[in-house]
């Protein structure tokens, strides 16, 4: 998978329904690859969505995928600000998980 490690939820899906998991991963790769919008920005968009929908671990993991795709700390900082603008303080509290040190 080009975007980094496979998230735990996909690993669980792979164990229970490998064929469907492959479909999900194929679609994910197609959508998140470089195109008119560079992959790192698409990944930052997913981080914003995770912040707004209150997924702190996902936000941290996606931020690390964005870094691996070439996103700078300044870009991650601005994505956190966008999450706050559209999701309010709860999204900000979740979004700051993007600053967790990568493992």
Where are these regions (language model features)?
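Residues at alpha-helix boundaries and short interhelical turns
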Residues: 14, 35, 52-56, 70, ...
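Residues within well-ordered alpha-helical secondary structure of globular protein domains
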Residues: 26, 48, 82-85
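Amphipathic, charged-and-aliphatic alpha-helical interface segments
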Residues: 42-56
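Mid-chain, well-packed structural core segment of small domains
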Residues: 54-80
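C-terminal structural segments of small proteins and small subunits
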Residues: 74-101
């Amino acid at each position: 998978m080009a975007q980094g490690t496979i998230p735990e939820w996909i690993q669980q899906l792979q164990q229970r329904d490998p064929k469907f998991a492959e479909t999900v991963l194929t679609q994910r790769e197609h959508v998140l690859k470089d195109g008119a919008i560079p992959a790192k920005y698409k990944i930052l968009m997913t981080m914003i969505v995770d912040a707004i929908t209150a997924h702190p671990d996902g936000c941290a993991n996606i931020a690390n995928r964005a870094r691996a795709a070439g996103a700078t700390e300044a870009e991650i900082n601005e994505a956190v600000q966008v999450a706050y603008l559209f999701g309010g303080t709860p999204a900000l509290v979740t979004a700051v998980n993007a600053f967790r040190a990568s493992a």
